[in-house]
Amino acid sequence: AIVIIFQPEIRKALENLGQKNFLTSFFAFDFSKGEIAKFTDKTINELVKACYEMGKVKTGALIVIEDEIVLSEYERTGIAVDGILTSQLLINIFEKNTPLHDGAVIVRGDRVVSATCYLPLTDSLSISKDLGTRHRAAVGISEVSDSLTIVVSEETGKVSIAMGGELYRNVDAEFLKNKLSFIPVSYTHLTLPTKLEV
């Protein structure tokens, strides 16, 4: 199940808890391991492969890609995985009737850090009524962070993404790859993507 967080005050508190400190807002480091959290072409390809393979067999999935705002508060609601991201790992996690398939996966750099995570649901009236909990959770987390969230529909097998409070439905693999390519290796030398401009 995905926990519903109704109160705006609670959602705002979680958003504030997710903000990085001064140093981590400029460097995409995993300080626990002393290395840069890289989001490589291989990781992108594995992600895209997993999403469309799951789509073919209508396996529902909810994958949150962390960007500059750390999602530790949501990560702690799930079960630690800390494994290198591969398409097979993601497919295994979301396989129906497995212990980890319910809830969201959080990805940081090239690693799946947590599964079965609880996310806030959007209360936006612009979301189509035919969309389920996964899509509302994807938009919800995108409203309180700069994450990119991928949804695979269990009903249709279609892939959608949520960014900046907006849902992009039924996207193809090239569109997804393009959006994932904005996830930086380091914030010191890359321009922030358009979605973060004000």
Language model: regions and residue ranges:
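Divalent-cation
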Residues: 6-9, 13-187
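Conserved small/polar residues in nucleotide/adenosyl-binding loops
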Residues: 188-194
